[in-house]
Amino acid sequence: MKTKKNTNAVKRLQCAALLLPGLSQTAVAGRVEETYNADFQYGHYSESNRRMEVDIFQGALSAPIGSAMTASVNLVRDMVSGASPVYNFKDANGQVRQFISGASPTSSCGKSICEQRDAISSGLTYFFDGASVNAGGGFSREHDYTSRYFNTNLSFDFNKKLTTVNFGASAAFDEIAPSPSTWNSRDSAFKAHKTSQQYLLGVTQIIDKESLLQSNISFGYHSGFLSDPYKWVAFYDGNAFSDFQQDKRPRERFEWAWLNQYVRHFGQFNDAALHLDYRFSTNDWGINAHTFEASWHQPIIDDWQIIPRFRYYSQDKADFYQTVFSGRSENYSSFSSDYRLAGFGAISAGVKLSKEVKSIGYAESLKFQTGVEYYDHSSNYQLGGNGSNNFSNFSYYLVTASFNLKF
């Protein structure tokens, strides 16, 4: 009986591993998905003061092909509307303020930003005894941005399937064609390109019948046009305005990240699971970032589950970031006032509630899930920060609803 109990515990941990981001096909390399899966998710993102709003629609379908292969296809549509920070300036008192793009009577939604992004991706996974190989690609398009990307992943199980090693690689080829507007002075024929490469090495280890640990190291290299064509930078001589230039960033960026994830199963709490994640990332632009996340997966009754979640994030500013610059632009090789490159911290908390219904007609199971998340972005939350960028603080909430059908 002890052997059977231990085996069941290992299976529960393997299922818990499948809940970790990026592990749905790699945590158990030899595991073939034997059912058809259809997924749909809707999300609504809204920033404070309704500055920016996004509606996200996602659909996915996966199906077995024979006894050793799975195919998948994913569709995404994002619809964005609102306003965005364009540049920073000094007011009459010398205080730095943020200029936000306003309403536009000529746009389809009456706001300065009306975007729609459509994306499609697909993949094939072939399962061996104790290994799997995955290859896929995708295409994403907006009116001013097009991306084509490819990816592959290899996974190997050994140590009686208690250890899994993952190798991953991806490449993206992007084309940027900024739309002529008040904040883009480039010629309408202007086009730029960007390429990205990502590599991953990871290990997933079942420690004992109640716990699992995953560790990933990833490397990335980006080259080409890495600036934001709709951002501007102001230069001052003291408090006197001296120059105004478009965002100019280095044409290369190298980055690496280390992610550690720990899962602990608690059978005494109705098979609950604790997930703890820590991620450190750094790049040669000078941005070091820390992310800590904790979530508790609690089955309740009759296949209901609740998942409260907490996340903390902190990053340093880029070497070439300033709210406004002193002197003239000729004195700087790169410059940006984009708040995303500033030093800041963020705290978010949320909860998800799901219900699974089994054996519905021809379907094996149907799972519904809804969730809400609140995010607060502030320079005061930065590790070692001084709150100097508090003019760009904001918050948002994200509401999601989804279903998964297995048949």
Spans of model-derived segments:
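Short glycine/proline- and aromatic-enriched beta-strand/turn motifs that initiate or cap beta-hairpins
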Residues: V28-I65, S72, Y375-H377, L398
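Outer-membrane beta-barrel "beta-signal"
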Residues: L154, E210, V351-L353, F394-F407
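Outer-membrane beta-barrel translocator domains and adjoining extracellular loop/strand segments
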Residues: R51-V54, N74, S84-K90, G137-S140, ...
